[in-house]
Amino acid sequence: MTEKILEKFDALEEKERILEAIRENNTDRHHRQRKKPLITPLLFDLHVQFGDTITPSASKIIKNKPHDLKNPKRSVSFKYKPNNSRSDLEESDLRPPILGTMINYEESKLMDHKEENLKSRPISLRYLKDKDETEYANPLPFPQLWSKHLCKKSAESSVPTPKLTNESNASKKENVSPPFTDQHESRTKKSMHSTDHSADSSTSRGKCPPKGITKESELTRNDEARKPHPVKQSIMLPLDCEDLLKNPKIKTIDLRPAVTVHTSMKQSHANPIIFYDTEYVQMLFLTKRFTPYAMKCTERNIVLEKNYEVLKVLFSDEPSAVSEPIQQKHLQVFSAEYAQKSINEKRKKKHDRLVSKKISPNTRYNLSQTFSSLSKKFVGYFDKDVTQGKSYKANRFERFSKTKPPPTRKLTTLPIKYDSKPLKNIFEIHKLNNMTPLDNLLGLRA
């Protein structure tokens, strides 16, 4: 940061030298005609234009004057010079145009304007040594690229001059010397000697900084390469347990057998499963394909359930084989034969139990309770047409009977074969004298 600031001040000094040479020629020609000099005071209001006070460092001025051992804390003195001789002009032309000669030349002209400028423009000047490193890190308030318009105004209006310390400000009155003395001549010679060194140093500065910049850039690149990046830390794999203890935030990948991977997949379902064994894959697909067939049939047949309820009412809550399905699908499973055998045995047991039981043939039932259900269920189930005769004059129901078989009062239940058609059973319904009009309506609707 300091080198960049010094380079910027060097560029400003070169512009000031060119403008001062032009001013000196103009002032030498027209000085006799004009009483007041054209040179403006040496106070540059940086805080007015750019919002902050920035001046050249005191360390730079001390380097430009290394041979000034008698007065190390010499303050800047301004002297008024009424008449300029040719010797002064020649000396000024021979001198290299550097800041030190400019200050000595302007000391003789601007003594009168010093007090007015100090009263009108009180400026608090700061130096690079007095600042901390945090202030150097902040960006500069003035722009890096100077436009021509700003350069002309700043150069014509003012020139920057540093103040060394508070002690120099306090000892200004004591150090002011008369206009023409031997001390002034000795000081000018010393300034000449110091300016030669400063010129050499300024030229060396102009050449050296690029090397320093390249070295700094190389060093910064090496430092950036050496610094551990957070992305690389996440990618690196620890080889020992000590690395995990030192840096517990490092990401680790467990290189373990495939069994641990399957246990972890149960916890995170979003991760894909990768298989390495072909036999395991085949078994998995087979189980997924055939497991639905191995499950029990849990679907409900509503028609069979209703028929079973009707038969329960008819046969006094005794089960019958009619409620069960006649045909069942053979499931293609691994144990299909065993399942089929068990089903056949259960059916045989149920049919044998029904045949062994004796049911009373002369049983009469109340038609008001079961007429509607019987007329709906049994007509479609036995695949026969039921003939209903009705006398409209007497409003009484006649006998329901099957057409083909002879009329009998017994209900016979024979063992049912698995692949046979429904049985042809005979039901006889007797007439009742205790009928109501509501029963007639039910009979008509049925």
Swiss-Prot record:
Residues 156-169 have a biased composition (Polar residues). It comes from the Eukaryota. Signal peptide: none annotated. InterPro entries: DUF4545 (IPR027847). Pfam families: DUF4545. Residues 63-95, 155-232 are annotated as: Disordered. Residues 182-199, 213-227 have a biased composition (Basic and acidic residues). This is Uncharacterized protein C1orf141 homolog. It comes from Mus musculus (Mouse).
